Regions:
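Class I Rossmann-like S-adenosyl-L-methionine
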Residues: 1-205, 238-241, 259
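Rossmann-like S-adenosyl-L-methionine
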Residues: 179-269
Length: 269
């Protein structure tokens, strides 16, 4: 993997810390589209791991620097720490590439970045042993979970927030019985027409991507439409009008249309 992947990771992270969403940042960073699937997966892994653990990473960083400015140098350090502590990246690679990134932009801070990351490498075992997943959850949220569900469930919720989510795929009703979709998509049928699989590789490479036979929709998002279908099961769906407000990204809208409802979907432009 070339330094280009870290360059692009830095560009994306700079945008995110300036209020741009992850998806918007991917569009704005010109070189993102030029990466192959493997490098795109690597960049996403860096950024999403960093975002999920950003509170913890900044707490660690605060032990090594007196002040954490909102600039690209801090983001380079964040990317370096993410690779050293949470990803299977050789330490020397994470440190050297981070130093080269800052050298291109602010040469006088190269030794600083190099020194901080090398010290983190030396302290790696101690830092990992002191990691607490719940630190990545805002305290008020974790306290509410603990009060409502108890400490064990609250901890499980925190653990789940750090995991890569599965990819859920909803198959069109008239297509579902015509093919073994669990095998075709390398997943498993959860319920109804929902197939769940590990979120790896490019969606465009999945079976029948261009044929309009399925769409991406989380299993939980499909439940409200299932309830509506059960409620109106004795009525001609074509004569039932559904108004969906806040319709993006469109999974429930597509599901309603697939069930022959007359749908009006609204969202901000």
């Amino acid at each position: 993997m070339s330094i280009c992947t870290r360059e692009i990771s830095l560009e994306i992270l700079n945008l995110i810390y300036n209020g741009i969403t992850f998806d918007e940042a991917l569009v704005k960073v010109e070189n993102w589209a030029k990466l192959d699937a493997r490098d795109k997966s690597f960049v996403k892994m860096i950024i999403l791991t960093l975002i999920r653990r950003n509170i913890e990473i900044d707490l660690i960083l605060s032990n090594y620097v007196k002040y954490i400015p909102r600039d690209f140098v801090t983001n380079i350090l964040r990317i370096g720490i993410t690779q050293i502590l949470f990803l299977r990246i050789p330490e020397y690679s994470a440190v050297n590439i981070s130093a080269n990134l800052v050298k291109k932009r602010k040469k006088n801070l190269t030794n600083f970045v190099n020194a901080v990351l090398r010290q983190i490498c030396r302290d790696k075992e101690k830092l990992i042993s002191n990691l607490h997943i719940q630190k990545n959850i805002p305290q008020w949220i974790f306290s509410n979970w603990k009060k409502s569900f108890g400490i064990d469930l609250a901890q499980k919720f925190a653990n789940q927030c750090l995991k890569e989510p599965y990819l859920d795929i909803n198959i069109k009703k008239n297509e579902f019985s015509l093919k073994n979709w669990s095998n075709a998509l390398n997943g498993k049928n959860l319920f109804g027409e929902i197939v769940r699989k590990k979120n790896t590789g490019s969606i465009e490479d999945l079976s029948n991507y261009s044929d309009g036979k399925w769409w991406i929709q989380s299993a939980s998002a499909s439940v409200p439409v299932n309830i509506i279908c059960n409620y109106f099961e004795k009525i001609n769906y074509c004569k039932t009008n559904i108004l969906e407000v806040g319709a993006a990204p469109g999974g429930k809208t597509t599901q309603l249309c697939d069930n022959k409802f007359n749908v009006t979907a609204l969202d901000i432009s």
